[in-house]
């Protein structure tokens, strides 16, 4: 498992490489919730997936074979950018975790 650093800003993009896979994440505000776009090696995995707590962002096993992401929050609060790095974090876990 690996924690992915997030900035407490409403819209952000980040790119990380894990186990020879390049992940591009876009996290943005959509009304009163956060949504995520996920690409792996330039291929779309998920678009505008709602960010929830303690549930994988990639809900389908066949799309998550190279790993998955989950928001960890206090008291099961929905992910919100103002809490990133304080009470909320994003973690990646690979197939061997």
Where are these regions (language model features)?
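Short, charged/polar N-terminal "headpieces" of proteins
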Residues: 1-26
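Generic structural motif
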Residues: 9, 21, 30, 41, ...
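Acidic, aromatic-enriched beta-alpha/helix-loop junctions
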Residues: 31-73
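Acidic, low-complexity intrinsically disordered segments
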Residues: 55-97
């Amino acid at each position: 498992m690996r924690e992915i650093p997030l900035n407490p800003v409403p819209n952000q993009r980040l790119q990380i490489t894990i186990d020879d896979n390049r992940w591009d994440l876009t996290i943005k505000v959509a009304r009163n919730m956060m949504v995520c776009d996920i690409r792996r090696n330039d291929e779309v995995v998920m678009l505008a997936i709602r960010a929830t707590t303690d549930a994988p962002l990639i809900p389908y096993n066949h799309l998550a074979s190279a790993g998955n992401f989950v928001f960890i929050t206090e008291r099961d609060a929905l992910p919100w950018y103002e809490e990133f790095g304080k009470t909320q974090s994003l973690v990646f876990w690979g197939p061997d975790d």
